[in-house]
Amino acid sequence: MMMTRLETLKNNLQAAFGQDLALTESLGELTLEVAAEQWFSACTKLRTDPALRFESCIDLCGVDYLTWGNGTQPEEKTGPVTRGRYAVVVHLLSIEHNWRLRVRTWAPDDEFPMVSSLLECWPGVNWFEREAFDLYGIVFEGHPDLRRILTDYGFIGHPFRKDFPLSGTVEMRYDPEQKRVIYQPVTIDPREITPRVVREDSYGMGR
């Protein structure tokens, strides 16, 4: 009986990583968990191993798990199940073998999240890492030009963090007296957003 492509990839990952392999499967997709200290070496192996050959990194992003497991519905309140607050995720493609893989690592320090840059492994992640730094504040050690890429250079904070205020912290406007754009604290009154109430399936029945 012939193995499927997914089974072949599983076996090849097992052979490459041995006891260090932490692999999960969901919806026909594989996710490889890698410790932060092995992030660069593991990704290098994924790219260079002839049995894997993930020569293309099609996406890199940050994730903030601050409120993970705290849903609005009772059945969604599973509590924290993560290894940390911030994660970095890459989606890889092997053109040679025609398969894909998701790889995730966790920043060990929630106060100063930092992982190794993958720029030497996949040069195309340059702006991806800058975006994750800009939006989440994740530092990529070894990146030669880790600057903001979407927000203004004077922007305060990282807007995709779960605890970033919806109204922001700074606003800018044109000052007719100074005849230039100026920055000032936000003048929007903060407000609490109440989640919508989801009615039960049986609501209104029996009336």
UniProtKB/Swiss-Prot annotation:
Its EC number is 7.1.1.-. The keyword Cell membrane applies. One of its GO terms (molecular function) is quinone binding. It is an enzyme of class 7 (translocase). It catalyses: a quinone + NADH + 5 H(+)(in) = a quinol + NAD(+) + 4 H(+)(out). Its main location: membrane. NDH-1 shuttles electrons from NADH, via FMN and iron-sulfur (Fe-S) centers, to quinones in the respiratory chain. The immediate electron acceptor for the enzyme in this species is believed to be ubiquinone. Couples the redox reaction to proton translocation (for every two electrons transferred, four hydrogen ions are translocated across the cytoplasmic membrane), and thus conserves the redox energy in a proton gradient. Belongs to the complex I 30 kDa subunit family. This is NADH-quinone oxidoreductase subunit C. It comes from Bordetella pertussis (strain Tohama I / ATCC BAA-589 / NCTC 13251).
